[in-house]
A protein has these predicted regions:
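Conserved C-terminal helix/tail region of periplasmic/extracytoplasmic solute-binding proteins
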Residues: 294-345
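Short, low-complexity disordered leader/linker segments with a strong preference
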Residues: 1-24, 332-345
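Short, glycine-/small- and polar/acidic-enriched structural segments
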Residues: 10-158, 174-177, 194-200, 328
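Stable alpha-helical elements in mature extracytoplasmic
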Residues: 45, 67-71, 86-89, 136-139, ...
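Alpha-helix boundary recognition
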Residues: 41-44, 76, 94-95, 124, ...
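Secondary-structure end/capping motifs
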Residues: 34, 216-310
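Short secondary-structure transition/capping segments
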Residues: 95-97, 114, 188-191, 207-209, ...
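Pocket-lining segment of extracytoplasmic ligand-binding domains
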Residues: 157, 162-260
Length: 345
């Protein structure tokens, strides 16, 4: 990690100055999600980001949350300006607070995990560990639906995702629904015992309140630049992933009060696979807002089973995608220091 003193990116417009009680810019994130947890850890340690925001009268704070649904009220109340969230909480969020979806953090799978040989139809009457209103919950709903079942046919056991593997191993639940890296790590450690009963593609994003991006567009671009820079940092040296994994394991322990069971190298291998799936870039494809996109299909499915209001409009979701922020930053790699790294230990 090399030190770098950033040059000025030009005069700071008066409208960009962020003074007074809101001088603190807050990013809410989930350290239990991969690879979003390690990406945000890199952003949190990014001195360039902090310097650029300081020039605009802004400080930076990161708040860890257990799941995406926990950050929705923070965005609503103005307690967070940026957040990471996956598909199901995102669909819920855009219907209650105007958002700008800035960049993509993952494209992997949420899974229902249980004993090998158990099928989706075998879940009837079973106890299933679940974190409500998460991408894991969405995967469970889809898997149950594929077998002609619904939530009423199973016993949902509310669990934090970090507790699910032990609950399954100890027989407290018969299966669990979770997002990466928990499913793959659980199966990888016990390949003869556990398998994926079903899975659903899961995507997650960095979002901002629309109010913040409208009032402070350059500050939003600086945060986007830190996101791009973090992924590039991971790409240029594989050891950087291990560094961020260590930071994230510490954040996870602080959040949950327990040391994660996963080892550093095991976690890093899973995170690298997720980063490679995105090409180490947060740039979003226009297909995300096509008529047959995963998100629109998910919204229609959630409406059909009463998980989001039937009045939820496609426009609220599609209109939240703000492609140009990351795209503008990537067109100006020198101005935004995309290949310069200065990460605090």
């Amino acid at each position: 990690m090399s030190a770098f003193c950033s040059r000025s990116t030009g005069p700071v417009a008066a409208a960009e100055l962020f003074r007074g009680p809101q001088a603190e810019v807050t990013v809410a994130y989930q350290p239990l999600a991969s690879p979003g947890g390690i990406i945000v850890q890199a952003m949190q340690h990014d001195r360039i980001l902090r310097r650029e925001l300081a020039r605009r009268g802004m400080s930076l704070r990161f708040v860890a949350a257990g799941k995406g649904g926990d950050v929705i009220p923070m965005l609503q109340k103005g307690d967070a300006h940026f957040a990471t969230m996956a598909d199901m909480p995102l669909i819920e969020a855009v219907n209650v607070v105007p958002l700008s979806i800035i960049g993509q953090l993952k494209r992997n799978y949420a899974m229902v995990v249980g004993p090998r040989g158990l099928s989706a139809k075998d879940l009837k009457g079973k106890r299933i560990g679940n974190a409500f209103a998460t991408t894991g919950h969405f995967a469970l709903l889809k898997v149950l639906s594929s077998a002609g079942l619904s939530e009423r046919d199973v016993a949902l056991v509310p669990l934090d995702v970090n507790l699910m593997p032990d609950a399954l191993r100890n027989g407290h639940v018969d299966a669990f629904a979770a997002w990466e890296p928990t499913p793959s790590l659980t199966i990888g450690r016990n390949p003869d015992r556990y398998g994926a009963i079903g899975r659903q593609q899961s995507i997650s994003f960095l979002v901002s309140t629309r109010e913040f991006t409208a009032q402070h567009p350059e500050a939003a671009r600086q945060v986007a630049a830190a996101l791009v820079r973090a992924m590039h940092w991971f790409k240029v040296d594989r050891s950087h992933v291990i560094t961020a994994v260590r930071w994230n394991i510490a954040a996870t322990e602080a959040l949950t009060g327990a040391k994660p069971q996963v080892g550093e190298r095991e976690y890093a291998k899973s995170a690298r696979a997720d980063l490679e799936e995105l090409g180490y870039s947060p740039k979003m494809s226009r297909s995300l807002t096509s008529k047959r996109s995963l998100l629109l299909d998910a919204q229609e499915f959630l409406k059909s089973i009463g998980k989001v209001p039937r009045a939820a409009a496609e426009d609220a979701l599609i209109g939240s995608f703000t492609y140009d922020i990351v795209e503008d930053v990537m067109k100006k790699p020198t101005q935004y220091y995309l290949s310069r790294f200065d990460y605090a230990p």
